[in-house]
Amino acid sequence: MDGRSAEEEERYKWKQSDAFIGAVEGFLVQLEDRLIDFKDIEYKNMKKSAEELLTLYFYKFTEIPMLNRMEAVMEYCVDEYETLCGKSLREDELEIISEKFLSMYESRDIYEIYNWFLEEQGFDTLPEVPLAERYLQYEDVYPVLYLKYRLCQNRQHRDIRHLVIDEMQDYSYLQYVILKELFPCKMTILGDRAQSIDSKEQDVLRFLPKLLGKKGLRVIELKDSYRTTLEIATYAQQITGVEGIHYLERHGKAVEEIRTDKMQAFEQILEKVHLGTDGYEDGYETAAILTMTEKEALEAYAFLKERREDVHYIDRDTSAFKKGITVTTYYLAKGLEFDQVFVLGGDKDHAFYKQYLYICATRALHELGVFVVN
């Protein structure tokens, strides 16, 4: 999210889209002809020609994913042989036969097969490195998972009767496809469209009816907002332009927008923090400084931590939330709420700026200050 170029952003969005799924499905059709080099199989009195194996693979076991299909062909041939011979093969014999069948695959490596797909699409391929040194960029995690799901036998979680998905706006089309395949059950999907961390608001309601089926689909829009003061709620509404929301008539301080330089912003935030632990009878329990990037958050944390003990930094590995002053990025603050929120910095020309400002604003319960840093 920090520092993603326009080209990387477009590539990421494509890899999460229905267009990507269409490209993968087309690739899989061609892959069937490329993936296996059929050869005659002979072990003792068990003999199968390449033509017989091809027929079994393409016509008898078509419902089985490609990387598991040759095992099904082998089991069929072994069962036939054992029936004719009237005895079972030993484990060591089955291992030899299995190796003969599986060696017909040009590759069974999902990583390598995904590289074939990337090459076909004109993208840079993943590094050809030993297994222990492999890693995936975030943009490739779900595409690889989808490809693996299509190529390998996967267990559906039929023991799950009802799936609840929160923050629905942060899931891509591809992720919903994977969830639908893994959990063939009823779902409750919750979220706020305006809080999308995509550069453009993603209205999942445009594609969910098609993906999940319109039958039995019920959409409920909640129009009442109780969490923030009317001043903060109105400020957030002006960012998104969403209308028709009823806000609770709870008034508080006006939202402050302050244009200043970075160091003055740090100093003013320290002055404005109003916690009960500072001796204020009406003091708050929590305050937060939210930034657009991790670099900005770390810089703010370093400055504030030197001046106050109760400053805490939240990163991806944080497991516990503490009272006091929290410093983190806006995307890690999703789902959290604070009595006071200070929005620090951010590039107004950045593709994520509107979502950044809205998410930060909706984290505040009582006071909101927005520092536009020169």
Regions found by a protein language model. Give the residues of each.
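Alpha-helical nucleic-acid-binding subdomain
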Residues: 1-163, 170-178
